[in-house]
């Protein structure tokens, strides 16, 4: 691979600079082999500060790969990734983590099971570079008060269990805690990769309501992958559809507010030239 020099790329939009600005981002895995896969192809995505976009797509469409590119899991073959005007294309993931919060589908991924609830929250401060002393010395009384206050907002009784190891919590409790950790220090960008898909319906709904509340209160720029078509149209203010590593449809505003699930599926057929290949998404047509 030829090493490219990082350079700021002007936004395609006029006026205020986007919070997230992807320009011509492409990525091919295992090039020149029988396992070659074009994972992302010429992705252009510009998101304003505070914008909340949902993402749906076919199986293997590149949704998680897009998140990995933004989070710094790999350097794309071509293109640039800017966050709040700063070129992060070549920055490693641990540097980007100070500005980017992320939740995965697996509720066990975002927490340290052998550490207590309060230690995990202190770790979130450390990730953001806010209080590097918190992990290596006694957690202050002030920090504990903040943690207790934030945990109480989850309405799961975790504020009374701060000394307990996180490994004793349920999947829903751990995912709610991960959401709190990812937003304890407000990130510039929040990536939600089907973060309620592995939870039971009641818990998923609770975590989703917490998500909506936190994102709205803190005005966080957010991208959320979902397999639920109703959620894709009801949450946030913008919806993207992906297929074969491309963004094939992007809708917001009045057009989005008028759309039904059937309209969205028809738009996919028009733009991708095929039916949506994702059983979970098709089943979600009848879910609410």
Where are these regions (language model features)?
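The feature captures the beta-strand-to-loop junction immediately N-terminal to the Walker
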Residues: 56-58
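Conserved ABC transporter NBD signature motif
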Residues: 79-87, 249-251
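ABC ATPase NBD coupling module
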Residues: 87-101, 109, 113, 133-140, ...
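ABC ATPase C-loop
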Residues: 182-183
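ABC ATPase nucleotide-binding domains
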Residues: 257-288
């Amino acid at each position: 691979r030829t090493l490219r020099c990082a350079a700021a790329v002007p936004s395609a939009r006029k006026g205020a600079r986007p919070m997230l600005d992807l320009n011509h981002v492409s990525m091919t895995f295992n090039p020149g082999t029988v396992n070659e896969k074009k994972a992302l192809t010429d992705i252009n995505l510009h998101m304003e500060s505070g914008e909340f976009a949902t993402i749906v797509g076919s199986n293997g469409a590149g949704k998680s790969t897009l998140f990995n590119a933004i989070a710094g899991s790999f350097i794309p073959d071509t293109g640039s990734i800017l966050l709040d005007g700063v070129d992060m294309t070549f920055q490693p993931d641990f540097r980007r983590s100070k500005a980017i919060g992320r939740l995965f589908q697996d509720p066990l991924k975002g927490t340290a099971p052998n550490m207590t609830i309060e230690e995990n929250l202190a770790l979130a401060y450390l990730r953001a570079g806010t209080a590097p002393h918190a992990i290596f010395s006694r957690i202050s009384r002030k920090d504990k008060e903040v943690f207790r206050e934030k945990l109480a907002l989850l309405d799961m009784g975790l504020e009374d269990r701060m000394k307990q190891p996180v490994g004793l919590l349920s999947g829903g409790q751990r995912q709610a805690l991960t959401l709190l950790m990812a937003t304890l220090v407000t990130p510039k960008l929040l990536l939600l990769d089907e973060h309620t898909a592995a939870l039971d319906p009641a818990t998923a709904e609770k975590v989703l309501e917490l998500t909506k509340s936190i994102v709205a209160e803190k005005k966080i720029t957010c991208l959320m992958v979902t397999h639920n078509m109703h959620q894709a149209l009801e949450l946030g203010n913008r919806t993207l559809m992906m297929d074969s590593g491309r963004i094939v449809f992007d809708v917001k505003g009045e057009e989005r507010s008028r759309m039904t699930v059937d309209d969205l599926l028809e738009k996919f057929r028009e733009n991708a030239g095929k039916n949506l290949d994702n059983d979970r998404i098709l089943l979600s047509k009848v879910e609410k």
